[in-house]
């Protein structure tokens, strides 16, 4: 007989662990965000996409509070032995600016709809809080839990945030780039659903590297008759020529609507950051392509073949 009290305690412990992990995912993004805003914390407003990214947002804020405290200490030390009250007050008054910029105006998520209806829905999910930043002066950093398709970014979020006239919009993903289908619970088997995959394919085309696509396809096709235990995930070769930053930059081009005034950048969590934040959870196959079973490799192999034969008509 299982004690309900014991089960409840274990669930509470697990919930607490998940909360800590999500906060740490946000905290670990401080360094790349600083680079994206050119270290101009004073003229940056931090926010989050409701509602799943809220915990990572708090972790990100804690990370920036720690950064700002270290900066305050250095600035005070530079004042020497006899700083004035005004000098100290000015430094100690520095604060990380956070606002709830994006508001979910209907309780719907875009993944519940399909096709065109998904795009129609995406345009109506979010609204913004005017007056939350100084137009043309402040950067806007806004964190989300993940970016898979990019549908809501392209159809809704970037355009809506741009109405606030920020100098720069930095979209932050608390998880790494989703590059591969899951196959173990989340139904997203089509390769062309992933904005990371689309970006990598576009980069290969632009840089006259279509031979990489052809080689990956033929390697995948040639192993279809093998036992699944002998199969290799050759889709990794599509991403291999590029850095995470190059792929993210191409995503920005693909997702930024025409007429957007603000400069846009996307910052992603790294795989190392993910593992450091969640050391007890080694499953990272939809980010890394390292499937835990041969069946996953077989399925991604077929998904890639299906995509190529549909698009390129091999």
What are these language model-derived features?
Residues 3, 7-314:
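PRPP-associated nucleotide enzymes
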């Amino acid at each position: 007989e299982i004690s309900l009290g014991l089960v409840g305690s274990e669930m509470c412990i697990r919930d607490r662990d998940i909360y800590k992990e999500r906060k740490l995912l946000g905290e670990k993004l401080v360094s790349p965000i600083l680079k994206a805003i050119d270290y101009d914390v004073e003229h940056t407003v931090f926010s989050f996409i409701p509602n799943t990214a809220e915990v990572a947002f708090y972790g990100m804020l804690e990370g920036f509070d720690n950064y700002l405290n270290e900066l305050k200490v250095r600035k005070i030390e530079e004042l020497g032995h006899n700083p004035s009250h005004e000098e100290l007050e000015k430094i100690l008054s520095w604060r990380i600016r956070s606002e709830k910029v994006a508001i979910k105006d209907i309780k719907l998520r875009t993944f519940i709809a399909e096709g065109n209806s998904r795009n129609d829905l995406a345009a109506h999910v979010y609204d913004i809080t005017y007056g939350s930043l100084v137009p043309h002066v402040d950067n806007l950093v806004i964190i989300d839990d993940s970016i898979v398709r990019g549908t809501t970014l392209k159809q809704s979020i970037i355009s809506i945030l741009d109405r606030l006239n920020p100098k720069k919009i930095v979209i932050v993903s608390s998880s790494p780039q989703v590059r591969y289908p899951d196959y173990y619970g989340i139904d997203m088997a089509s390769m062309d659903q992933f904005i990371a995959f689309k970006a990598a394919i576009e980069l290969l085309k632009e840089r006259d590297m279509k031979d990489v696509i052809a080689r990956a396809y033929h390697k995948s096709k040639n192993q279809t008759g093998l036992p699944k235990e002998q199969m290799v995930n050759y889709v990794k070769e599509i991403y291999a020529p590029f850095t995470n930053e190059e792929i993210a930059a191409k995503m920005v081009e693909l997702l930024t609507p025409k007429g957007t005034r603000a400069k846009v950048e996307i910052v992603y969590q790294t795989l190392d950051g993910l593992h450091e934040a969640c050391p007890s959870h080694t499953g990272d196959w939809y980010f890394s392509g390292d499937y835990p079973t041969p069946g996953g490799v077989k399925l991604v192999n077929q998904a890639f073949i299906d995509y190529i034969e549909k698009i390129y008509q091999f």
